[in-house]
């Protein structure tokens, strides 16, 4: 697809889906060391359903969607759902959950106060425990088994029927809308949130394409 800096990132994703719908988009290892995969078409379908669910529960540009998860297919679904509707996506290191219990999750609490997410996806049980302790008023989503009734299983979210509301929400997106808050390491203090926009993300993709020209990898 064209990589004009005026495009929205979701346009690039949707163009790829249209070009290679049955191609594997992501693969991850399962507990038995086999591969779990998802095609571009299925990734879009599930992300669109999740985006519809977020819209129906009040998501917009003022309600960031935080993800406390490792790199995973589930993480990608939430990320693309956020990009589809213009709700800022905020990935948070699982280390905040794994290592934070000893100090009452101080770093996670700081980030929650900074970002004020309307929704939080927690993949592991450790992540669920952390966000439940620190953000009980946010709308909580989990990948598999929920440790508490407060969590909504992702399986429910990705089966939401899509309506015309989703297309209207995507149509309103612009190149300069904020797509993500990326957190700094906080090595010299507390983490800071760095804004990313659609324009910035498209430029980053264009730079990668330029670097790979002539390699046969793009």
What function would you assign to each model-found segment?
Residues 3-27, 45:
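A short N-terminal helical cap/helix-turn-helix that marks the beginning
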Residues 21-24, 142-143, 156-183, 190, ...:
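Conserved pre-ATP/AMP-binding loop-to-beta segment of ANL
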Residues 22-77, 97-106, 156-162, 196-199:
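Conserved AMP-binding/adenylate-forming core of the ANL superfamily
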Residues 37-41, 171-172, 179-206:
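Conserved AMP-binding A3 loop
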Residues 55, 73-93, 208-209:
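Hydrophobic alpha-helical segments in the ANL/AMP-binding
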Residues 69, 138-148:
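Short beta-strand elements of ligand-binding domains
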Residues 90-133, 161-163, 204-218:
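Conserved ATP-dependent adenylate/AMP-binding module captured primarily in the ANL superfamily
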